[in-house]
Amino acid sequence: MAEFDITRIPRYSSKSSYAHFDHRVSFAEAQTKILDSEYVSHHAFYPLISNEIIAVRYRGGKRSCKVRNIAYASHFDHRVFQYYSYLWSDLYNKKAIAEEFNEVAVAYRSSLSSCGAVTAVSNISSAKMAFDYIREQDSAFVLTGDFESFFDNLNHVHLMTSLRSLFPSGRLPDDHYQVIKNILRYSCWPIADLAARHELPWPAIDPTREKMISDAAIELRFKSIRELNKLDVILPKSEFLANKSKVITRPWKRTGIGLGIPQGLAASGVLANIYMADIDMKVRLAVERVGGLYLRYCDDFIIAVPKSGFDALVEAINLMADVDSVKLQPEKTKVFRVDGGGVAQLDFESGRAGKVYPYSGVHPAQKVSFLGFDFDGRVVRLRQSTVGRYHKPLREAASAIARSNQGEGRHASKKRVSALYQHYSPLGIKGRGLCPSAGSDSSAFFRYGNFLSYVARAQKAFPNDPIAPDESKIYRKIKRLSAR
């Protein structure tokens, strides 16, 4: 194993704010036990707390919700998963370098190793790499897509085999086995039950009827979580022991063959990379023969080849379609031809069979989308859904201030107005007005910045594309909505 600088672990001396079955603990406080492999190999893990993250989206003025199941670990267990994720990431990085697919996986590549062989990349730099490659071609074929319920369908046997392959002996040390066993055979305590035990409201939702999920239900759940997180521990030990066998669920047992790992654990991302390692190597070899490009950001991927390399793209399509236990998401997996005339979507099944036929469905895509950016063959823009997630909370926050200003002598506080500008205006961009300058303490500096900070970084990466909005229009919108 490589030597790690443990103090570089994120939030090394900090405690998390959420409540769980154990007391809050920093990595620094738990370090002695976590670094003791004998202790870890016999450690009893708490159940995870399961919850649903509801993301509200606006596309073309229409509201939709995406419901994602997550589960989070107790404080000590999270630190264990965090540490072992770095150990596994280091082993994965060595394999990726040795077998020459190091440039493929661009997410969850953190390393505390002193070798520094892996350079972290962002979704912005990954999107730039992809679109720059496509622009360099006179004509190119492109495949974009992702996998349906990726984490829920990872095959346990395949994942264990892939993880064992990272160890020279082909066998997991006892402590590593104990950690991965508790990730694969995880149990969950639903947060709805915990809210009920504290007499907090938890509105039921139907994930299959996204349009029926109200903002009021989302807000009520959020308030209940906030109240739960004020607790020192989420349940007294006696109540935990008396009820755990009756309440906990084991989602991985649902099919009888061992599928799925929880999304949201510190180790989930690196395990996804390990799961995909063999496919990544095969796809990279296929497209590299024709000078192509393959990038994967967790379950999102893009493959691009020059026009002459269509056969390599067909091979890559079939490799991605045959990943063990996971399926491509049909509505998000698309084949394109990109040339001077723009972007034309092709029929996926025909492409898989080695034929180039136009897409025959309704509303063919006219843009290649990857990691929050759209490319129409000429320019790169932020996706409308990405921008929509900025404008909705801006409207809500500004309108709330406008309501506070109604009535004679009533005015929103300066602190509230300042927060509005920090969160949603160019003044909130790192290093400007309401944010610390680059000379500030770095730990504080990186906690600041808003969506427009991200936009500014994207504009810097794509200097000749219309990424950033007109700042004067943003100020006018804020003033109009807040009636200031």
PLM regions: where:
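Non-catalytic, polymerase-adjacent accessory regions of viral genome-replication enzymes
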Residues: 1-64, 471-484
